[in-house]
Curated annotation (Swiss-Prot):
Pfam family, one: SmpB
Family: Belongs to the SmpB family.
Keyword set includes RNA-binding: yes
Any one Gene Ontology cellular component term annotated for this protein: cytosol
The keyword Lipoprotein belongs to this UniProt entry's keyword annotation: no
Molecular functions (GO terms): RNA binding
Name assigned to this protein: SsrA-binding protein
Keywords attached to this entry: Cytoplasm, RNA-binding
Length: 149
């Protein structure tokens, strides 16, 4: 598995509850651009329309050697999931008010592009502060243990 890009902001802004692996519908120049230069997850999210899941605001830069038929960098891209998974996602988003965010995009062992999406709940500002405090405390404890071996 070759990871192309990860959404680091997702882990700090959301509590991730569940993850799914989804295929993604891409054009040829998009796959070439992913192999060449990667992707940008800034402000990307998933939306469900007509029983299909779409990935919005994922920026895949244009392919350098492309011609006039090059792709639009921020077009909505359809995610390929089983119907059961889509229905489960719809239920969680509507009933519990959760959001679907992409966390990782990668090539699997067969060379196919996959997106890891997560069902997540947004963190409040005080939750983020608590996480930072916990990280600092753990860092200090580990530093203390290293010194006093």
């Amino acid at each position: 598995m070759k990871v192309i890009a990860t959404n680091k902001k997702a882990y700090s802004d959301y509590n991730i509850l569940e993850t799914y692996e989804a295929g993604i519908e891409l054009r040829g120049t998009e796959v070439k651009a992913l192999r060449e230069s990667g992707a940008n997850f800034k402000d990307s999210f998933c939306r469900i329309k007509n029983g299909e899941v779409f990935l919005l605001n994922l920026n895949i830069p244009q392919y350098r050697n492309g011609n006039l038929n090059n792709h639009d960098p921020e077009r909505p891209r359809r995610l390929l999931l089983h119907k059961k998974e889509i229905h489960r996602l719809i239920g969680k988003v509507k009933e519990q008010g959760l959001t679907i965010i992409p966390t990782k995009i990668y090539f699997n062992s067969r060379g196919l592009v996959k997106v890891e999406i997560a069902v997540a709940k947004g963190k409040k500002k005080y939750d983020k502060r608590e996480d930072i405090k916990k990280r600092e405390i753990n860092r200090k404890i580990n530093e203390y243990l290293k010194r006093n071996r």
